[in-house]
Amino acid sequence: MAEDQFPGWHGTTIIGVRKGDEVVVAGDGQVSLGQTVIKGSARKVRRLSPGGYDVVAGFAGSTADAFTLLERLEAKLEATPGQLQRASVELAKDWRTDKYLQKLEAMLIVTDGKDLYVITGAGDVLEPEHDVAAIGSGGNFALAAARGMMDSDRDAETVARDAMAIASDICVYTNGNLTVERIGK
């Protein structure tokens, strides 16, 4: 998330790790305005259950915008039960083409325990090549750290937590107060 994209507001780090039979999404709790930490315990990872279909989503960017997108994703999942990819593509298409949604400033990581995607306002639905996705100001740090741990005997949650710890040590807009959600295949 670039500084010019969200003037004055900085950061968060969200990571999704798929390893073995589980996927973990973790996010830090820091919200900053300029050089000031406004809140240290924000919850940016959520469990959704549209129609009994379990999905975990993490977001970076404007909270209100992210909630709008999560509501839209839930509606897409209710319309296409059990089809996260299709619902994600439909959300990305709407986000890209709808004049109201185009103004929303957020990114999402979503998983159903099988698939893992990053959804952007540019219309992208990206599936990571190496079973790790990360977004936000500390996303590149967390991504690099997690990729370095994927061949170890650590489970998905340990990889996510350790990668977030590294990101929070490097990125001043990321803290170590984590929300972690696990979901199995």
From Swiss-Prot:
Any Gene Ontology biological process: proteolysis involved in protein catabolic process
Keyword DNA-binding appears in the UniProt entry: no
Binding positions (Na(+)): 168, 171, 174
GO MF term set: metal ion binding; threonine-type endopeptidase activity
Pfam families, sorted: Proteasome (PF00227)
InterPro entries assigned: ATP-dep_Prtase_HsIV_su (IPR022281), Ntn_hydrolases_N (IPR029055), Proteasome_sua/b (IPR001353), Proteasome_suB-type (IPR023333)
Taxonomy, superkingdom: Bacteria
EC number: 3.4.25.2
Gene Ontology cellular component terms for the protein in this record: HslUV protease complex; proteasome core complex
Assembly and binders: A double ring-shaped homohexamer of HslV is capped on each side by a ring-shaped HslU homohexamer. The assembly of the HslU/HslV complex is dependent on binding of ATP.
HAMAP family to which the protein is assigned, alphabetical: HslV
Function: Protease subunit of a proteasome-like degradation complex believed to be a general protein degrading machinery.
UniProt protein name: ATP-dependent protease subunit HslV
Gene it is expressed from: hslV
